[in-house]
Amino acid sequence: MYILLTLLTKSTMESSCDNFEGLEHYYYTDAEPSSKCNKFQASGGSGVVMAESHIMSSEAPPKSNPGLNIRTNCRMILNLLREKDCSVTFSPEQPLTPVTDLAVGFSNLSTFSGETPKRCLDLSNLGDETAPLPTESPDRMSSGKLESPKTQFVQFGGLFTPDLAWKAKKCPKRNMNSVLPHLLCSTPSFKKASGGQRSLSNKENEGELFKNPNCKPVALLLPQEVVDSQLSPTPENKVDISLEEDCEMNILGSPISADPPCLDGAHDDIKMQNLDGFADFFSVDEEEMENPPGAVGNLSCSMAILLSGPLLNQDVEISNVNNISLNRSRLYRSPSMPEKLDRPMLKRPVRPLDSETPVRVKRRRSTSSPLQPEEENCQPQRRGTSLKKTLSLCDVDISTVLDEDCGHRQLIGDFSKVYALPTVTGRHQDLRYITGETLAALMHGDFNSLVEKFFIIDCRYPYEYDGGHIKSAFNLHRQEEVTDYFLQQPLTPLMVQKRLIIIFHCEFSSERGPKMCRFLREEDRASNDYPSLYYPELYLLKGGYKDFFPEYKELCEPQSYCPMHHQDFREDLLKFRTKCKTSVGDRKRREQVARLMKL
């Protein structure tokens, strides 16, 4: 063969060496294959004989260009030798283009002899339904005859080489249904309608489906039929997709669905082959598939019954309240238990009938217990004096306390009698006020049956007193004067049944009169043992001389009114205020000295 090639090349090189640049390009024409060349057979040395016979039987080129005929023959021989080295065979049915030639050549490689190769699993494209997939050659699609319902895919060398005989010995048929409970929440399990009907002539592709693990993760729970529909361009599979969508809508009614059982042995083979290499880790006998254990096989069924079953009605009889047990309620009782409610009506258990204690008597008298009538009937009558609940401060109404306080306030300073004159409320809550009308009635002798003698103390400054005052009133504006007049020689009534009362007032009875009244009470308390007092009944004229003068001028002398801040008595006001403050300071110092001497 090499000798022939050398002779042809040498003769061609002598004629025209510059025309061999086109040897690298070779194209088939649209003429019939029998008129151009015979098929080159890739077997031993028969290729040379076929090439020689082809050269001898080819048509003679035109005589005008003998060098072109030699170059054409050399190109044909070189291309046939190149095709022999690549071991490429051509289809005898029709001429093939270079792209179709490449596809058919790879499909006829010896690596894929005896089975239909499938593409490897690409996990990144599972969610993309429109991803382009490699399909078979166009000449087989145009023929309209498919040996297998599954589409054949071109797989390039080195990616996947199945070995069914080795896997059949190493991995026997197993079933994963009894190992892992198929609780596909929100993901129904599909079963193809035409999965059990397979062509008998498709024996070489039987059991050669794409192998993927049956136990998919949550993110990869895709139906097997959807994947098959993506790999098949035939219209029959498109019809199956619509049927599968209807099946999906029917199955999505329940949140938990079990994987449907296999109907034939071929489907079991498909499931076991989908396990790929994971069957060694999750292998279970086929007998366990038919008779699954109770703990695992009934898991999905029991959960489905629990979620989809009707609600249990718990009958509660209100009339049988007395028959309910008096035990503490269970906090964590299951709401699905069919038993009746035996909850207690009382917080505390019933004491034995023979325990006669005061605690039991108190509980028997409680109105919150529904068992009160029965306990009263069963309780024997106690003889003698019964224990009574003492009155505590918590049980006393606050209004009662206030009423009692008001009752105590109606008593005079030594708590021996009530006030002889009607009193009213005023600015100072600790002092007793009388109105001008009451003072006028007192001066007219309306209270002579109760009052033996009364004193009206005018606490205003002397210029105010000289400008107008109440008849028979004493002007005592200094504390020393009050102490000397009432405490140096205390006054006592001649009759024990009658009273000796003192009435204080100033211009408004808001500052000077209340201060003098409190001072006398404090000095009187200090001079006597509590609660004894020389002058237990003290009053304040409400509104002072200002309110009394307009209404009762006849009881005032002179019948005039001189205010404290009169323009003509400013100097007198400053002088009397200074004396009052000095006297107050001296009094405080004397009190402190007296206290130190007592210590």
From Swiss-Prot:
| Annotated SMART domains | RHOD (SM00450)
Q: Signal peptide location in the record?
A: none
Q: Where is this region: Disordered?
A: 125-146, 334-384
CDD domains given in the database record = Cdc25 (cd01530)
Q: Which residues lie in Basic and acidic residues bias regions? A: 339-359
- Keyword Phosphoprotein assigned to the entry: answer is no
Keywords tagged on the record: Cell cycle, Cell division, Hydrolase, Mitosis, Protein phosphatase
* Pfam families reported in the protein's UniProt record: M-inducer_phosp (PF06617), Rhodanese (PF00581)
**PANTHER family, alphabetically?**
M-PHASE INDUCER PHOSPHATASE 3, M-PHASE INDUCER PHOSPHATASE DUAL SPECIFICITY PHOSPHATASE CDC25
Question: So what family is this one in?
Answer: Belongs to the MPI phosphatase family.
What is the protein name for this chain? M-phase inducer phosphatase 2
**Gene source species:** Xenopus laevis (African clawed frog)
Highest lineage ranks of the organism? Answer: Eukaryota, Metazoa, Chordata, Craniata, Vertebrata
